A protein has these predicted regions:
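Active-site-proximal N-terminal segment of extracellular/periplasmic enzymes that hydrolyze or transfer
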Residues: 133-190, 432
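Histidine-centered active-site microenvironments of extracellular/periplasmic hydrolases
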Residues: 421-526, 579, 584-595, 615-616, ...
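A long, amphipathic alpha-helix that forms part
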Residues: 346-347, 367, 374-415, 439-449, ...
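Short, structured active-site-proximal loop/turn typified by the sulfatase FGly-forming signature C/S-X-P-X-R
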Residues: 172-209, 214-218
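Metal-dependent active-site segment of extracytoplasmic phospho-/sulfohydrolases and closely related
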Residues: 396-436, 573-576
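Short secondary-structure boundary/capping segments
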Residues: 173-178, 279-283, 382-389, 425-441, ...
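His/Asp/Glu-rich, glycine-adjacent segments
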Residues: 131-133, 214-382, 487-496, 522-541, ...
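Juxtamembrane/disordered regions of integral membrane proteins
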Residues: 1-106, 110, 114, 118-130
């Protein structure tokens, strides 16, 4: 009975529709192979066309069945079976029909390989986002191994973080019909949309440390300089992230009770972590097994490859369209960025969803996952540009799949969708003023002073580096050993470093103070941090005016700077703008309030940042 039910579920109308489409395209593909391969020859087209139709029909029928049968095995088994099958039917066709001639081992082998590639592309493309396909090849595979539901009396929680998504953008996306799953949850009353305001440093490290550990004290920006040790701390460098978590955690984080951390910056003290920046240094081999389980499934493998390639095509089209219409502001999107984008929007998303579905069928009590794709695309395309909204639409579709899996899992689950921070649309400081903040500071001090700066690399590079670092640490897998050999020149202290931050890691072997840099300028989103390294303590407003008399007046009068914060020996912390000063200690305002166009909470944010041990000598706000 079970076999009969499985057969009836497999051979559906959708299956037969796909077979017909594949058949037609197989004919075109085989005709193409006959045209380009010298060993495949058609002597009489009147009769050979029927042979070609037969070969194509056999492929169209057998291939979906092979995918179904080989799901429990590996991609290698799947490829070998299809190569042997295609080679056999090409040879057999030549024996049966003299008008279809296949001469020589290589012509048969290349023909078989060509058919296999064509089949893989067709099957992957046609099943790429079919609900039925995903259900059968992913959800049902987990469902067959799910835990005993009798064990779980309390519901679990899945925390789904969309990196960099602001409340207004989310509302607009829902109103435009781009996020129907979230709209349905809101309309049903199961969810509410609540807006919150993040800290002064609007970035993942500060927000996620607070969410997962209840503490984000002394994270002044995405990257900052520490005078006590002469080191630049970068939030998404694994060894720095581990150190930050050690400072933040009291051992009782959000996920401490048998929870799971998936693709986050911090662990939330979860006992089960995968692809989490702060724990990469202590990984064991078990953590990479899920990756292998994902890729040995032929459906997952074909789906990932085709989605990845298609996203690169979408990115190239979006970049071309921006240039064609002269859409501004825009940033450079060449080089490795299309691959980096596909890695964050497709590769990490697909792995994260796969891991969460597996977690739910195991019945884990809680899991927290960060989806970084929207943030990466929004930084390059714009926060509400079509391709950024498209990332949200596709992510919403994945949330529906999680919901479907939860309905079949052994434990009931609640979904909490949240964001760590938002972002605003605008040109960069460099685009507007033809100089970086570091160059601006350099012009305001004497030439004898050395100025050090560090590029703010895309967070996507950090995600890619973290994944490669985790993957290569598996001593048992040959693929990991090969990867270690390939990227050894870009590996430092056991961590992979690709992208612009490679230069920072080279420099990081020597503390900044030993390289005679007297001024360190670090950009971080809307903030700029200026440190004077000849002083071990925080330099006061009065001493800055005494030693660098042009810096403060020059910064506050610059059209690209909203205000700066410094600490006065006499008046305490002050926010200084072009036309006035806000004395943060007592709330007094002299002249025009530089904070009037910002949140009403801005003074409180600044007062708190002023208490950080590693707050800069001058905090610059755009």
């Amino acid at each position: 009975m079970r076999l009969r039910r499985e057969i009836s579920e497999f051979f559906t109308l959708a299956w037969f529709t796909r077979v017909l489409i594949i058949w037609a395209l197989e004919v075109a593909g085989l005709l193409f192979l006959v045209a380009i391969l010298p060993g495949l020859t058609v002597i009489n087209w009147d009769t050979a066309i029927w042979t070609i139709l037969l070969i194509s029909l056999l492929n169209a029928l057998i291939w979906p069945t092979l995918v179904y049968l080989t799901v429990p095995f590996t991609v290698l088994t799947f490829i070998l079976l299809t190569l042997v099958f295609n080679g056999f039917i090409i040879w057999l066709s030549g024996q049966i029909d003299p008008s279809f001639e296949s001469i020589g081992y290589w012509s048969i082998s290349l023909g078989a390989l060509g058919l296999t590639v064509i089949n893989a592309l067709l099957i992957g493309f046609l099943a790429i986002d079919f609900h039925e396909s995903y259900h059968r090849y992913v959800i049902q595979q987990f469902s067959s191994k799910k835990a005993n539901s009798a064990k779980f009396n309390t519901p679990g929680v899945m925390f789904l973080e969309i990196d960099g998504l602001s409340a207004p953008v989310l509302r607009n996306a829902i109103e435009m019909g781009q996020m129907p799953t979230l709209a349905r949850w809101l309309n049903s009353g199961s969810h509410r949309l609540i807006e919150w305001e993040c800290d002064l440093s609007s970035q993942t490290a500060a927000s996620q440390a607070g969410i997962l550990h209840g503490n984000n004290f002394d994270i002044p920006a995405f990257r900052w300089y520490e005078k006590d040790n002469g080191k630049i701390m970068v939030s998404n460098h694994p060894r720095h992230t581990a150190e930050i978590e050690q400072r933040m955690s009291n051992g009782n984080g959000l996920l401490v009770n048998e929870g799971a951390s998936r693709g986050n910056m911090f662990s939330g003290d979860a006992p089960d972590v995968m692809f989490t920046f702060s724990t990469l240094a202590g990984l064991s081999n078990v953590h990479t097994k899920t990756y292998y389980h994902y890729f040995i499934n032929p459906y997952n493998f074909a789906r990932m490859i085709e989605l990845f390639i298609w996203d690169i095509v979408l990115e190239k089209y979006a970049a071309w369209k921006q240039k064609l219409t002269d859409e501004r502001p825009r940033v450079r999107r060449r080089g490795a960025y299309p691959i980096l984008r596909a890695f964050t929007t497709i590769f990490l998303r697909e792995l994260s969803i796969y891991m969460l579905i597996g977690d739910m069928f195991k019945g884990i009590p809680s899991a927290y996952t960060t989806f970084v794709g929207y943030d990466e695309v929004a930084h390059h395309s714009g926060i509400e540009r079509p391709d950024a909204i498209d990332v949200l639409r596709k992510l919403d579709h994945q949330f529906a799949r999680l919901e479907e899996a939860a309905n079949q899992s052994p434990r009931r689950y609640h979904f909490v969708v949240l964001s760590d921070h938002g972002q605003s649309q605008g040109a960069t400081f460099l685009q507007r003023h033809n100089m970086t903040l570091a160059e601006c500071v350099r012009r305001l001090i004497s030439e004898e002073h050395a100025v050090e700066s560090a590029e703010h690399a895309s967070e996507g590079w950090g995600s890619l580096n973290a994944f490669l670092t985790e993957f290569m640490k598996d001593e048992e897998r040959r693929a990991s050993r090969i990867l270690r050999g390939i990227i050894k020149p870009r590996t430092y202290s056991g961590n992979v470093v690709l992208g612009p931050d490679h230069r920072h890691y080279v420099h990081d072997k020597k503390p900044i103070e030993k390289r005679a840099a007297e001024v360190v300028v670090l950009p971080s989103g809307n903030l700029g941090l200026v440190y004077f390294t000849d002083w071990k303590e925080r330099l006061s407003y009065e001493k800055i005016r005494e030693n660098f008399p042009n810096v403060i007046p020059g910064l506050v009068q610059h059209p690209g700077i909203g205000f700066i914060m410094v600490r006065s020996e006499e008046n305490g912390p002050m926010a200084i703008g072009a036309k006035g000063t806000h004395f943060l200690e007592n709330g007094m305002i002299e002249g025009e309030d530089p904070l009037k166009n910002f949140s009403s909470n801005a003074p409180e944010h600044l007062r708190r940042s002023d208490t950080f041990p590693h707050v800069p000598d001058i905090l610059v706000n755009s």
